[in-house]
Amino acid sequence: GDNGLLARVGVDLLSIKPRYKGEASMLQNGDIVKYTALVDDRITTVSPFVYMQYKGDKFQFRVKSILAQAGEHMNLNGGYGVTAKSNGLDEDGHWEYTPVRYSSSWVSMMYGKKWQGILFAGYAKNLGTADGLLPDTTYNGVNYADISNNYLSKNTYANINSMWRLAPGVVRNWGKLALSLEWHITSVQYGELLKLKVVESDGKKTTHSYVQAENGMAENNLHWITNHRLQMMLKYSF
């Protein structure tokens, strides 16, 4: 059957072109001429992972750990940022990028047949960008990058530092019918984004959010927020 030990090691490779056109400029008859150019932007990321599972008659065990770069396509906190812009005179207009690195590990256990005890535990840590971001402003001697000029954490929040979840539960099985009750405890450590009001070209004031340019993180005023959730599910398997 499917009982026994299974182990896997793998790598997720992602290579994308964030833009295909951009602004460039050249000197023509003594004038600086700006134009839209086709650019060769590209970011390539490598995310290694390990996975192991064990299945016995009554006991099941699974564990996975991944070190992700720009892992939003794997439903992880991710994204990438801009490290350099070649928008100067006689430059081709391309940008350089760096990924957000994210470590995520979890373990899942189940024991029993008619009555089953289950436990899930997971931890994730934002490790920041691999290289420093292109700074947009300096505040109190620290370089900051505007989130709107980058592609950070589009599916979640750029100010998440780390998080953990613990979810114990119990399942009662009646053949194809199962009733489960789970208690999810989730805690997230947030940092405080730098928020500054900017006067735009049309004279309007808008609030911009910034992360530290050194690592793409928000590490000021770190604080934990914990959420408790009870979840009950009735399932019938055809």
Indicate where each model-derived feature is located.
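Outer-membrane beta-barrel "beta-signal"
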Residues: L222-F238
